[in-house]
């Protein structure tokens, strides 16, 4: 489990309380004045001002509050072989689909990718993503899958086949499988870790399409492998395109993420068109659905 510790001044403490109010959880530690859980990460604020992030997305969330991470570069030592790398975008957003991409990158691609400025898509602006992604789609063999919100709601949820993790396992597995079916021969397959290897393998047993190659799940893989960085950028662009299309469909600007703005837009859609509008453009099992309904009472 990743753990990041920071010191928060009064301004940052107030921001944490405001931003994460909807994710508040109880905590019996008398020295903890605020606690929340978001995207698999627990956030603890202590009376001393100490701010602790614990969980798989600790670094990503902490960076929103001033944490500066020492990034690992995409060094040639870790990727001087043909690699398939995968990443997903949209799993933390209430509106929009879930995009998963697998890309096949060889050492001969490295110079071109570095020239384009390929890196962790989370550090790139949406405008830069939109510029780079079409070039990558033409130059790099890849498979891109998009699970629309409507289809997502049919397969993910309490009474459906998948949960939020198993559906990602299915999509990552399928994207890799399709690349392998096209004859590409990686010496390594890397997934930007969203769960433990044990958990991944347990869910993988339920998948029809299997392959023999070993899979490696690594945290922050988009910073280590150009193949994962490519997938991250293409997936981000695919997600943004889908979000824009859905916005046009419903006539409202749909925000990315799962914050209070998503609650407000969802409540407006509910009032105007009913639950069917959210079935079309949002992931219904998110807590935002109930929060949006509460705003109408």
UniProtKB/Swiss-Prot annotation:
Cofactor, free-text remark: Manganese or magnesium. Binds 1 divalent metal ion per monomer in the absence of substrate. May bind a second metal ion after substrate binding.
EC assignment: 3.1.26.4
Top-rank EC class of the record's enzyme: hydrolase
Protein residues bound to a divalent metal cation: 87-88, 192
Matches recorded under Gene3D superfamilies: Ribonuclease H-like superfamily/Ribonuclease H, TATA-Binding Protein
Keywords: Cytoplasm, Endonuclease, Hydrolase, Magnesium, Metal-binding, Nuclease
Coiled-coil ranges (or none): none
Locations listed in the record: Cytoplasm
GO cellular component terms given for this protein: cytoplasm; ribonuclease H2 complex
Named cofactor requirement(s): Mn(2+); Mg(2+)
GO MF annotations in UniProt: magnesium ion binding; RNA binding; RNA-DNA hybrid ribonuclease activity
SUPFAM superfamilies in UniProt: Ribonuclease H-like
GO biological process: DNA replication, removal of RNA primer; mismatch repair
Reaction catalysed by this enzyme: Endonucleolytic cleavage to 5'-phosphomonoester
UniProt domain RNase H type-2: residue ranges: 81-297
Protein family membership: Belongs to the RNase HII family. RnhC subfamily.
The protein's role, per its UniProt record: Endonuclease that specifically degrades the RNA of RNA-DNA hybrids.
HAMAP family per UniProt: RNase_HIII
Name assigned to this protein: Ribonuclease HIII
Gene giving rise to this polypeptide: rnhC
